[in-house]
From Swiss-Prot:
UniProt-annotated binding residues for GTP: 23-30, 66-70, 125-128
Family recorded in the similarity comment: Belongs to the small GTPase superfamily. Arf family.
Lipidation positions, renumbered (N-myristoyl glycine): G2
Molecular function in Gene Ontology: GTP binding; GTPase activity
Gene3D superfamilies (UniProt xref): P-loop containing nucleotide triphosphate hydrolases
Expression (tissue specificity): Ubiquitously expressed.
Name of the molecule in the record: ADP-ribosylation factor-like protein 2
Sorted UniProt keywords: GTP-binding, Lipoprotein, Myristate, Nucleotide-binding
Amino acid sequence: MGFLTVLKKMRQKEREMRILLLGLDNAGKTTILKRFNGEPIDTISPTLGFNIKTLEHNGYTLNMWDVGGQKSLRSYWRNYFESTDGLVWVVDSADRMRLESCGQELQVLLQEERLAGATLLVLCNKQDLPGALSSNEIKEILHLEDITTHHWLVAGVSAVTGEKLLSSMDWLIADIAKRIFTLD
């Protein structure tokens, strides 16, 4: 029995996943996490550091790390990469001015060795706002079709209304589960 098989068996008992939420500041990471956890979203302030939520969903324990996206904090993102099973990249669909920067930051992340193999979910948030770009437009602008190193999905969501948030997170969890809880 190989080392990876032993690790998978240990993780299978725990049914635990580590999910990292990243994106530029004001993209809606904290709002998404609170909405997903069933918490009120009326008082949210910028994340100056990180939030950790542990919650149960579909029979799994999810350790969700919401890390601040301000430019001054991005150099610290690498401190959170270890043992990440899923990466949720949150995009502000209404912030056309920073889409190029958003794409550049994502490309840097995808080259990180410690994130190799992590499932990627790109959430195009704020779909409820007038003028928000569609998930297809963002997929094109961010060149997501070029990603071959990760399983990925792009989804248009609204953290405020909850639109498509649950189905997107369910996809992420199912994809991670197939990868880390299935013994070959």
